[in-house]
Each structure stands twice: as C-alpha cells, then as structure tokens.
Amino acid sequence: MARFQFSLEKVLRWRTVELASEEAKLKALVQEQLHLQTLLAEVSAERSKLISSLGAMPDLRGDDLRTLTACGLRLRRNAENLAQQLLRCGRDLAKQRRSYSQAKRRVRLLEELKHRRLEEWKYQEAAQLEELASESFLANWNRERI
C-alpha cells in the first residue's frame, strides 16, 4: 500500500507561509492604526487642556497669548497631520484586509482540494484491498475444491 502524497503540497506550504506574512502585515497595520488613534486622542486632550487653561490664567500678557496661540496652532497641525496619517493607514488597512482574504481563500481552496484527493485515495485503497481480499478468498476456495 502506497502512502498518500498530495502533488501540490509544496504550493500549499508556500501559500500558508504567504498567508502568515499577510496576517503579520495586517496585524502591524492594525497596531499602527491604534497607535495613531491614541496619539490623536492625546493631541485632542492637550488642545482641550490648553483651551481650558486660558480661562484659568489670571494675568495674560501679549507674549503669553502669542505663545498659547503658537502652541494651539502646533497642536492643530499635529492633529491634522495625524488625521491624514490615520486616513492613509485606513486605506492601507482596507487594502491589506483584501490581500489577507485572498491569501486565506487560496489556502482554503488548496486544503479542500487536498482533503478531496485524500478521500479519493482512501476510497481507491479500500477498493484495492477489497479486490485483493476477494482474489485471495477465491484462490483459497479454488485450492480447497481441487
């Protein structure tokens, strides 16, 4: 009896490695998106603190207002920059999700094909074994009759 061999085993292994790579890229992009969201929330919180601190300052001078305005502009630019990066990351994430889905589908199709071929092989092995048993029985039966 021969062992089962799937002719596309190397392709399946390569596709599995490809799937793992796509999954790693996806996880990295998700982490980047979470990091950017955290940074954006921190910048927004800092801007809120700056605005609320304006009312709490007793003696505001021109230099103080200029400094606060410059700080507010810097925070706004940072927030806009982070929002742009977040949009870009979202687009990259959507693209990577599609790549991951395609890689997963390719692996699943090969695994299903392997399963079908294994079932066919088992059926053929069982048929051969049945045929061998029948021939053996008939040979013994014929020997006993003679």
Language model features by range: what are they?
Residues 1-146:
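Charge-rich amphipathic alpha-helical interaction elements
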